[in-house]
Amino acid sequence: MEPILAPNPNRFVIFPIQYHDIWNMYKKAEASFWTVEEVDISKDINDWNKVTPDEKYFIKHVLAFFAASDGIVNENLAERFCTEVQITEARCFYGFRMAIENIHSEMYSLLIDTYVKDSNEKNYLFNAIETMPCVKKKADWAQKWIHDSAGYGERLIAFAAVEGIFFSGSFASIFWLKKRGLMPGLTFSNELISRDEGLHCDFACLMFKHLLHPPSEETVRSIITDAVSIEQEFLTAALPVKLIGMNCEMMKTYIEFVADRLISELGFKKIYNVTNPFDFMENISLEGKTNFFEKRVGEYQKMGVMSQKDNHFSLDVDF
C-alpha cells in the first residue's frame, strides 16, 4: 500500500509535520484565501449591455460549466480523496480546498445571477449538467472518475486534468476579454480562481511524486489526451471561441500546450511539443511556474501567512 494511503493513527493531530513540501502547499493555499464580497462586479453590467449576443452566449455557457464543475470537484474530494489519503498535511490541503471550491462556485453563480435577469434562463444555466449537452459531456467524464475502481494515482491524474485542462481554455477565453478591457469583475475573479486552480494542479503533481507505485506513463498519457480532445471539442465545436473573436485553431494548440506543461510536471515526456499561441497567457498560473504567490494577483495575499520567521510568543516587550 502507498504510504500516503496507509492507516495513520496520528492523522488527527497536525504536529509534528512529516511532509514539509505538502504542508508548504497548504500554507500557500491558506495565504491566498479570498471571498466573493471582495470582488466588485458592479461595473460589469455596463459592459454586459454592450457585448454582442454571441459574446453573451459564450460567457453564459462558460459560467454555467464553471458553476457546476466546482461542485463535482468537491464531491470527489468529500467521497474519495479526503477519506483515502491518511497523511494530515494533505488532509489539511483537501479540507481547505473544499472551502475554496465553494467560493469559486458561489462566485460563478453570483455572476450568472447578476448578468442574467430572466428566471427561466437562470434555471437553465444553473442546471447546465442536465440542460447543456456540451457541459454534460465534460461533467460526465469527471463524475465517471469519482466512482471509478481505478487506484488513487489514476484518479489523481484525472482530476488534475479536470482542473488543469478542462478549465484552461475557459480561463484563457476570459483573460481574452480582460485584454480587451471588458468585464472587470469577471476578469478579476478569473485571475483569483485560475491562480487557485493552478495551485490545485501543482498539488496533484506533488501528491503524484509521493506515490511509490504511480500509474504508468501510458496510462497517464491516455487520461490526458482524452481530456484534451474533450476540451478541444468543447471550445471549438460545441461552444466555439470564435463567438468572442478568438481563433479556434490557436485555442486547440493552447489546450495541447497546457497538457504538455501538466505531463512535464508529472515527470513524463511532452505529448504535443507545441508553443503557447496566446501571448496574453504567458504569466497565467495554469501554464506553469510563474508563481502567482510571489506576484500576488491584485496584491491579494493574506498578511503574514507565508512568513518564514519562527512563531515564538514573547513577554519581554517594554510597555
From Swiss-Prot:
Amino acids binding Fe cation 2: E101, E163, E197, H200
Keyword Metal-binding among record annotations: yes
InterPro entries for this protein: Ferritin-like_SF, RNR-like, RNR_small, RNR_small_AS, RNR_small_fam
Keywords: Deoxyribonucleotide synthesis, Early protein, Iron, Metal-binding, Oxidoreductase
Subunit: Interacts with RNR1/OPG080 subunit. Can interact with host RNR1 supunit.
Statement: the UniProt record of this protein carries the keyword Isomerase: no
Catalysis: reaction(s): a 2'-deoxyribonucleoside 5'-diphosphate + [thioredoxin]-disulfide + H2O = a ribonucleoside 5'-diphosphate + [thioredoxin]-dithiol
CDD domains in the cross-refs: RNRR2
GO biological process: deoxyribonucleotide biosynthetic process
Classification lineage: Viruses, Varidnaviria, Bamfordvirae, Nucleocytoviricota, Pokkesviricetes
Cysteines engaged in disulfide bonds, as pairs: none
Molecular function per GO: metal ion binding; ribonucleoside-diphosphate reductase activity, thioredoxin disulfide as acceptor
Name by which UniProt lists this protein: Ribonucleoside-diphosphate reductase small chain
Enzyme Commission code(s) on record: 1.17.4.1
Role description: Ribonucleoside-diphosphate reductase holoenzyme provides the precursors necessary for viral DNA synthesis. Allows virus growth in non-dividing cells. Catalyzes the biosynthesis of deoxyribonucleotides from the corresponding ribonucleotides.
Family, as annotated: Belongs to the ribonucleoside diphosphate reductase small chain family.
Region (Interaction with R1): 313-319
Induction of its expression: Expressed early in the viral replicative cycle.
Cofactor section: Fe cation
Pfam family, one: Ribonuc_red_sm
Active site: Y108
Binding site for Fe cation 1: D70, E101, H104
PROSITE patterns named among the record's database cross-references: RIBORED_SMALL
